[in-house]
Amino acid sequence: MTSAGGNPQPGRRVPAMSVSEQAHTAGRVKDLGRTVEFSWPGVYFEGRFRGTGLGVVLDCAAADYDVQVDGTTVATLVTPGDTTHWIDGLRDGEHTVRVVRRNDTPGDTSTFGGFVAAPGGAVLGRPAPRDRQIEFIGDSLTMGYGNVSGTRACDPEQLRRTTNSDVSHGALTARQLDADYQINGLSGLGMVRNVAGICPDVTYRTYYDRTLLNVDGDVWQNPGTWRPQVVVVNLGSNDFSDLTPGEAWTPDSLAAAYRTAYGEFLRELRTRNGAGTLLVAVGFDRNAEHVRQVVEARNDAGDSGVHYWYLDQSGLDFLGCEGHTSAHDDRVIADRLAPFLRSLPTGW
């Protein structure tokens, strides 16, 4: 899928400026100067340019991207490969551009090489970052798993094409609050147990510190510009998925381990972000009471900056792939979560 007027060209053009000079991003990236590498879903790059067209420089054979000009999606790039994709036929003048990674492909690394102006135009300096920042931590519900499918029955190809982190409830909530955001979501993983007991040697926390998810031992280097006022954690749907034969867990041992690990994770987030960041722990379905207990324990231990929010399922149709939340559901959740975040002592 590409826009009318879009023109993919093999091979990457080299922009005149480094990526960090011409593009604003809040996502986790490894800055290599002329390019940046990234893995997490929902990572976005925002720029400004003058002229009638723009080239988007990408090297990614695994993920899909939306290209938005002046707030409108003008192209969806499906596993574009090593290319400069041109958007042309625009009115002559100043424009904004946004490139966003739609889906999760944790086994692959993506490369963004910036923007190239069409003849007679120019790439302008990057937009200013927003004052507000929110991090969303979670699983498939956080990253928009199959949310634009319109059906629960999806094959793997349909799942890849219909996952859109840019309309996940986290992205929509952040836009309502005019906040930059990170969608640090990984499908299928939990706090201590993954869906159906798969991959028992790893959990979400195995990968959380990374920039590049497929690189063992990789650690994200915060450039100093990421200081979220709010971190929203929604992990537990996979932990409490039905136990399978042969697993060592019992319901009681799983619940106890989950609560312990969740409390440890909140303490780690507090150390990472400092006392001023509010931590919001989301209760959903089978994990709700356990999360509430963890929040209560953190409050009793003196951390009043940890808050509980219950994700109400009323009005949700779960028409995403495999019964996940749909784009409709993501809008409903965002319309409920944004007012809650406004009610917290952030000054928002």
Predicted regions and their residues:
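Active-site donor-binding loop signature of nucleotide-sugar glycosyltransferases
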Residues: T79, L186, L311-Q313
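Conserved SGNH/GDSL esterase-like catalytic core that processes O-acyl groups on lipids
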Residues: W40-G42, P106-D108, R152-D252, D285-E289, ...
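A structural signal for isolated positions on well-ordered beta-strands in alpha/beta enzyme cores
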Residues: R98, E135, Q182, T277-L279
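N-terminal secretory targeting modules
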Residues: M1-I137, L141-T162, W348
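Alpha-helical cap/lid subdomain in secreted, periplasmic
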Residues: D70, T206-W348
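Conserved beta-strand scaffold positions in the cores of enzyme catalytic domains, especially
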Residues: F136, Y181-I183, Y308-Y310
